[in-house]
Each structure stands twice: as structure tokens, then as C-alpha cells.
Amino acid sequence: MGLHSEPLDQEDQDTIILDARAGDLDSLKDIFTTLVSPELLSTCKESESDSTALHMAAANGHIETVRYILETVSRANSAEDLKAFVNEVNKTGNTALHWASLNGKLDVVKLLCDEYEADPFIRNKFGHDAIFEAENSGKEEVETYFLKKYDVEPEDDEEDTQTEGKNSVQITKGTEIEQVTKEATEALREETEKLNINKD
């Protein structure tokens, strides 16, 4: 009897997603060698969020599970389909790289970027790319990796002249969120002033 090759129902997809989330590599290998065609791995999505098995394994730092998922999808699909899978977004616009970055999973981030050319500049629905997620969540090792690999610099960095010579790429920690906070504080202050004026 051959492997199942028809589209999977949601219950079966959720089982695969849960195995990826838990890093249950043995279960995934068993499923995709004895039960289900490997071509279907890239089609599995979590019902609530549209997150893939790759999202789940990457977010939790299960490096061997991530490697297995990528190798399986690579063997069973075209290079174009693999690239689309690596950069696939869920309902909130996050890629697997966003989640690995947010959680500081450096080994997973390196695997995704160095071997599978994951795009760190894809922005989610909040306007954040994977580099911002690493910085914003204080994952300095991941942030440093991104800054060195992609030679990115923060926008409007006024400390360039003071930090020159230390590294080729410098970033003032937290500047993006500081700016957003300043803008929000200013908007709130203006609204408060309007309310006070209206009371008089």
C-alpha cells in the first residue's frame, strides 16, 4: 500500500503541527515514511493561525526537527516551492524566522538564513521584520548575527561618529522602540491637553 497523497484533513494536519511544536522527530519521520507522502508536509497548517510545522519547530528551537522538515520539503518539492515554504507567513504575517528570532533560537536562525536563504526583511502585520523582533525582545546574539550577515544599520543613528572603529555595524539598542514610545507619549500628551482644554 502506497503513502497517502490526498490532501490531509485538519485533524491530521494538527497532529503533524503538534509533533513539530514538541520536536517529536521520531513521530514525524514515522508519519512521512510509512503513512503520508512527504509532499504534503509543506501543506500542513495549524487551523487557528495558519502556522506551518516549520513555524512551530523554529519557534521552539528544535533544530533537528527544523532540519528534517526543510530537508523533507526540499526533496519532495521544487526549489521555488521550498523558498515559498521557508518564507511562508501565518495570519499575522510572521515567518518561521520571525518566531525563531523573537525567541532567540540562534541555531535555527542560522540554518534558515545560511542554508535556506530565509528573508529577514519580510514585515509582519505590525510592520516588524525578523531583525526588529530579535532586537525588541533582547535577543542580542541573534541581533548581532543579523547585523553582521546583512550589514544593516539602524536608521537615523546619530552615534555613528562616536562608535566608529569598534565594528563595521553599530546599533543603538532599543532606538526603534524608543522612537515609537516617544511618538506615542507625545500623541497622548496632546490628547490630554485637548481634554483639559475642553473641560474649561
Swiss-Prot record:
This protein's UniProt keywords: ANK repeat, Phosphoprotein, Repeat
Check the UniProt entry and state the signal peptide residues, or none.
Answer: none
* Example GO BP: regulation of protein localization
* Coiled coil start-end: none
Q: Which domain of life is it from?
A: Eukaryota
- Ranges of Polar residues composition bias in the record: 164-173
- Is Repeat one of the keywords? yes
Q: Where is this region: Disordered?
A: 152-173
| Compositionally biased tracts (Acidic residues) | 153-162
ANK repeats, residue ranges: 49-78, 92-121
For this UniProt entry, the molecular function terms from Gene Ontology, in alphabetical order, are: DNA-binding transcription activator activity, RNA polymerase II-specific; unfolded protein binding
A Pfam family this chain is assigned to: Ank_2
Q: What else is known?
A: Present with 13100 molecules/cell in log phase SD medium.
Q: What does this protein do?
A: Required for normal rate of cell proliferation.
What the entry lists under PANTHER family is as follows:
ANKYRIN REPEAT AND PROTEIN KINASE DOMAIN-CONTAINING PROTEIN, ANKYRIN REPEAT-CONTAINING PROTEIN-RELATED
Name the chain's protein: Ankyrin repeat-containing protein YAR1
Q: Which organism is it from?
A: Saccharomyces cerevisiae (strain ATCC 204508 / S288c) (Baker's yeast)
